[in-house]
Design a protein with these regions (language model features):
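Short, ordered, surface-exposed loop/turn motifs in non-cytosolic proteins
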Residues: 1-17
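Short, acidic Ser/Thr/Gly-rich low-complexity loop/linker segments typical of extracellular
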Residues: 14-29
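A short, solvent-exposed beta-strand micro-motif common in secreted/extracellular proteins
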Residues: 30-51
Length: 200
């Protein structure tokens, strides 16, 4: 089943002369597990994730096999500071930065690829742009497609976490979208880790 905030794993079973790709979806955290495969050699490729394309890697499966892929995310998003208001104010401001990753050798992308940022808030520790995993009235979206990537990378953005209730626990993270992901069947965001806050 197609998963939001995940990637697809393509496997080519090399025991066949003209193999049909076997496909399954990783979890949102990038881990994947498939217990329905036979031992043998496979070419394995992670694809349709928020990262630049990678070459297939040859994997020999025998019993429980662990294999890690190294990928380069489209964007690196960092929360630089969380600023809390006075006690009772229920005010929280998040400062964050967005940077492009180094484009892999042999690839060319434009100068206006960062299209959107989102400060997401939820009352549960699962926070995502998809599957109703954020509270809209507490979250903020910025359209960045009119700015150059260079100007975006030079800034520290500040967004409020809106409409909070003093003393309540929330979970926040920042997401950013690159137009490099638009050829995917579903836009893929790069995220910061989830951070727990308590509204002052």
């Amino acid at each position: 089943t197609k998963q939001a905030d995940a990637c697809r794993i393509d496997l080519m079973d090399l025991s066949y002369e003209n193999p049909t790709p076997l496909q399954f979806w990783a979890k949102a955290d990038g881990t994947f597990r498939n217990v329905a495969l036979f031992s043998g050699d496979y070419d394995v490729t992670p694809t349709e994730g928020p990262f630049f394309p990678v070459e297939a890697e040859r994997v020999h499966l025998k019993g429980v096999t662990k294999h890690d892929f190294k990928v380069t995310p489209f964007l690196k998003v960092n929360i630089e500071e969380i600023v809390y208001g006075e006690p009772g104010s229920a005010e929280v401001t998040v400062k964050y930065t967005i940077r492009r990753s180094t484009t892999p050798e042999g690839m060319t992308i434009g100068q206006k690829t960062i299209s959107e940022s989102r400060l997401l808030c939820n009352i549960y520790p699962v926070v995502s742009c998809y599957n109703s995993c954020y509270i809209e009235e507490n979250s903020t979206t910025k359209v960045l497609s009119r700015s150059t990537d260079a100007s975006i990378e030079s800034r520290v953005y500040e967004d409020p976490v809106k409409n909070l209730k003093s003393g309540q626990k929330y979970y926040i993270r920042v997401a950013a979208l690159s137009s490099c992901s638009y050829n995917s069947t579903l836009k893929r965001y790069n995220y910061t880790p989830v951070i727990e806050i308590v509204a002052p």
